[in-house]
Amino acid sequence: MWCHNPETQRFEQEIQYDAEKCTGCGVCAKVCPNGAVTMEDGRPKLDKKLCKLCGKCENFCTQGIREIVGQEYPVKTLVKELMKDLMFYEQSGGGVTLSGGEVMAMSTDYVLAIAKALKKEEVSLTIDTCGYVPYEKFEAILPYVDTFLYDVKVMDPELHKQYIGVDNKLILDLSLIHI
């Protein structure tokens, strides 16, 4: 199975880099003050436990392929940023999609606050979800969301358990509630 946005699966910042474009020059390992980047067989290896996200490997990468991804935003700041695109939402009939990792597994209060703020601004909200979360999380946010985009990987329960690791009954049951 494949995730269409794997760069957004974690809730904290992390270093991301394009291994195919890496030349193996080793600059990232040389400049890392914490020894988090080492070279193994001509390729950089990152020890996430040692990485302090200082950004030196990103800044000194000769190929420009390292990047710190993920950023925490207070609700007000995020909504203010999203409202910069209001003209596009109005012209296209679109809105905001919360996606990546599993939005519904995040803090319910945080997601609910974003949803309420966008509803107040009359901006359409879609949430991309796998749907594998308790119904109560959906129940609280339901009045503020226009669309739930269910990312169902496999319909067959046995294959779903084999490939994803969990049964898909909860996912399918919740998707029927929102139809």
Regions found by a protein language model. Give the residues of each.
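Iron-sulfur cluster-binding cysteine motifs and their immediate structural context
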Residues: 1-11, 27-46, 56-71
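Conserved AdoMet/S-adenosylmethionine-binding subsite of the radical SAM
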Residues: 76-178
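Short cysteine/histidine-rich metal-coordination sites, predominantly Zn2+-binding motifs
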Residues: 15-21, 45-50, 70-81
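Cysteine-rich micro-motifs
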Residues: 51, 55
